[in-house]
Design a protein with these regions (language model features):
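Class I S-adenosyl-L-methionine-dependent methyltransferase catalytic core
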Residues: 1-172
Length: 172
């Protein structure tokens, strides 16, 4: 897998092995997501604080860092996947103040207000397909109630094709 744009364009990153670990977002979808985000922030991510709530391979969050995001906080519940995300980011970004990887459950952490790095301007939501919209809505509500979302925050929710048209009620 490669970074598609920004400072680290073309650089390789590793992805977790095993069928049940993650399902990395394809290059085409990552490019579309990055284009939407860049457009939403007038092509300037310099002050954008990013939360990658379900890290997986880490590719979406790393893509935002590559394109200039101020900071990235990535949550990943699987220890091995979290280690790999850390390794990938370390190979690209030496400025440790710009990123952190948290091994843990973002839903539980958000409900207790324990999500470092906020308030967030951009929340990347690419949960396991089995999640559906309900836990994502709960996560966003908790982030908002805990003061972890910046005014006008942008959330990008990737979901199964079968769920097309559905979205958390709190999305505009």
């Amino acid at each position: 897998m490669r970074i598609i744009g920004g400072e680290w364009r073309g650089r390789k990153i590793e992805e977790p092995r095993g069928r049940d670990v993650t399902r990395p977002t394809t290059d085409r979808v990552r490019e579309a997501c990055a284009s939407m985000v860049m457009s939403a922030f007038d092509f300037d991510l310099d002050e954008v604080r990013v939360l990658d709530a379900f890290g997986g391979s880490g590719a979406l969050g790393i893509e935002m860092l590559s394109r200039g995001a101020r900071s990235l906080t990535t949550f990943e519940i699987d220890r091995n996947a979290a280690r790999l995300i850390t390794k990938n980011i370390e190979s690209l970004c030496r400025d440790r103040s710009r990123w952190r990887v948290v091994t843990g459950d973002v839903l539980a952490s958000a409900s207790r207000g324990r999500v470092p790095g906020g308030p967030f301007d951009l929340v990347l939501l690419d949960p396991p397909y089995a999640f559906g919209a309900e836990p994502v809505e709960e996560l966003l509500q908790n982030l908002s109630q805990q003061g972890l979302l910046a005014p006008g925050a942008f959330a990008l929710f990737e979901h199964a094709a079968a769920d097309a048209g559905s979205h958390p009620a709190c999305f505009k």
